[in-house]
């Protein structure tokens, strides 16, 4: 079942190249607030579609339209994640302050971070299936019931699998691109060659890899939610 979800998500992310390009542009400029909000607003739309989908179906990524609603959805998406992550983030920062590491506080922060990520990952599809209600994203007891119906062990393994697959793909592509950039620097041994090579590397990572992995992850979120 879980492997089928991964397979579906990989295929889904590659069915509409034009969307990858649009998301790539937004990803490239995501240091700016507005492009980032639209980026996450579209990802929310993918989650919502996926909660209504069958595994190994033939859905394609949704249209990039209704920008006003997409922007609002993006704000909700970001707000939900920030709210879930703010407490563990503060604890982790405090554990690293004063020039030393408080190991106990750091461990507590990392455990809370994992728990927050597990809940926030289901909070988005739960919100999408409850009338886009922001309040529903914080119905922790209800989200916990969904998690329990999926199976705690299966859900945690699925989530960690998504992270592992995403990180592995990113690292492999990063290493391959680094090798290509090194060859480019040897062929064009100037400061301009180094700049061009690094720029092309960032271009591939932000225009192709980042949007592809974001579609993969959000598609998985909606499909895993459906198991519950």
Give the ranges of each region predicted by the language model:
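Selective recognition of hydrophobic, aromatic-rich stretches within alpha-helical transmembrane segments
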Residues: 28-54, 100-137, 171-181, 190-228
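Selected alpha-helical membrane-embedding segments in polytopic membrane proteins
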Residues: 36-61, 65-97
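Interfacial aromatic "cap" segments that immediately flank transmembrane helices
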Residues: 3-29, 64-90, 118-171, 218-219, ...
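Low-complexity, intrinsically disordered extramembrane tails and loops of integral membrane proteins
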Residues: 1, 7-8, 55-58
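Membrane-helix interfacial "entry" motifs
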Residues: 58-73, 98, 102, 106, ...
